[in-house]
Amino acid sequence: MISSLAAITGGPSTFRRDPDSNTLRLSRRKTLISVLRSCKNIAHVPSIHAKIIRTFHDQDAFVVFELIRVCSTLDSVDYAYDVFSYVSNPNVYLYTAMIDGFVSSGRSADGVSLYHRMIHNSVLPDNYVITSVLKACDLKVCREIHAQVLKLGFGSSRSVGLKMMEIYGKSGELVNAKKMFDEMPDRDHVAATVMINCYSECGFIKEALELFQDVKIKDTVCWTAMIDGLVRNKEMNKALELFREMQMENVSANEFTAVCVLSACSDLGALELGRWVHSFVENQRMELSNFVGNALINMYSRCGDINEARRVFRVMRDKDVISYNTMISGLAMHGASVEAINEFRDMVNRGFRPNQVTLVALLNACSHGGLLDIGLEVFNSMKRVFNVEPQIEHYGCIVDLLGRVGRLEEAYRFIENIPIEPDHIMLGTLLSACKIHGNMELGEKIAKRLFESENPDSGTYVLLSNLYASSGKWKESTEIRESMRDSGIEKEPGCSTIEVDNQIHEFLVGDIAHPHKEAIYQRLQELNRILRFKENQIDIIMGF
């Protein structure tokens, strides 16, 4: 397209003289940039581009910069690259615009390649282009650019330093990230937030909290980063405590904060707090985006309120694949298997392409509903219809489905014939089904395989012990328990949580660590006496 336009207007502008005055050129430049910025559709760009060429602005760095930016923003990065390629001797700003375009379009390799070409063409980089290319870098390229940064004297650039810290943190190079942080002259809340993320990425949540406490002025992003770090490191109670502290400090939360807190609520089953966050989102007039909506559906589903999950799903305007995946998973969790299948059909009819997560959710729905024929049909159509290669989770769903309907031998043959090695979860699922359906012989065979294949966990011992016990083989059941004890394997203690006044309290079996343990155990004894009294009253009434 560009070459044809150039032919119409007489070839590259490098060889043409613009007869207009500088004043007129500046006026046209301003107009063209304004028109480009107002462009909302790529279909309108070619006519504007033609005018740019006719008015000799196709080599004007200011106009070309805006043209590249607009094309990239409108998802036409190839058009943007054609524009860039037509420029004689592009400067560092045009390289920056084009690299940004590649990176924002997910073409990181092209962005890095163009940066290397810029260096090869002796165009001196600045901190802006370095920051842009760092967004596309892996650890290896980051180290190369870090060496260039030091050589070219950009080591003190704040934006470059923050971006390199982020890459080092995500790559597990915590020492390098900390070194860059320590060398920064201005370690304000922004730099601290990046370092908090680095600590969280690497699992050093204690260090992240210590740094967070040292930050004097914390903004919303800093609070959210710390809450997110706690959630990602499974410190859900601490995440909720920090959110409450954030509210007491009158720091405004945003949708990212809300999603982090909703994730913690989902994990802990904190329905009331989740409802409060939902009302907070509505009161703050936050948009019910996919990001927030999907988190709400997940929270309500996992906290037991599937009706509210349905309502949120219905009112969401722009659903995506994740929305459907979350809703289908929630329905499966609550035994609404037929409804889950209907949502899947609606998803496909609306043009959404199912992915691996979708099909795991759908197979789980079939499993929970005992829908064997539909489940097998879905599994057999994964590769053929949806071009999704079955993974171990999908095979595990079929084993669970066959086990639930009592077809244990068929499930075992299925495991024997799958192209991947079954894990302890898949084998444990079938062992559990053997206990339910009383198939001692197959249960022993699976247990033997579990003991031989890897270090068995407490669940394997407990399942086999219970299988023997349910069949009246008390001696064998006791021997398995003793073997478990002799191997030094301990069963994880039972755990329960209750939510009181938006606070989560966790209790373990035989727990004596709670600060109010004396009052708790006293109350439990009182409740036990009341229950025994009520039981005696019922016995008297029934005549026992």
UniProtKB/Swiss-Prot annotation:
Q: Where in the cell is it found?
A: Plastid, Chloroplast
Presence of keyword Repeat: yes
Span-the-membrane segments of this chain are none
Pfam families reported in the protein's UniProt record:
E_motif, PPR, PPR_2
Where is the region Disordered?
A: 1-21
Pinpoint the residue ranges of every PPR repeat in the record: 60-90, 91-125, 127-156, 157-187, 188-218, 219-253, 254-288, 289-319, 320-354, 355-385, 391-421
Q: Where is the transit peptide?
A: 1-25
Instruction: State any single GO MF term.
Output: RNA binding
Q: Which cellular components does GO assign to this protein?
A: chloroplast
- The leader peptide range reads none
Ranges for region Type E motif:
426-501
The superkingdom of the source organism is: Eukaryota
Task: Write out the entry's keywords from A to Z.
Answer: Chloroplast, mRNA processing, Plastid, Repeat, Transit peptide
Role this protein plays: Involved in RNA editing event in chloroplasts. Required for the editing of a single site in rpl23 transcript.
Give the PANTHER family listed for this entry: PENTATRICOPEPTIDE REPEAT-CONTAINING PROTEIN, PENTATRICOPEPTIDE REPEAT-CONTAINING PROTEIN ELI1, CHLOROPLASTIC
- What family, per the record? Belongs to the PPR family. PCMP-E subfamily.
Q: What is this protein called?
A: Putative pentatricopeptide repeat-containing protein At5g59200, chloroplastic
What is the native source organism of this protein?
Arabidopsis thaliana
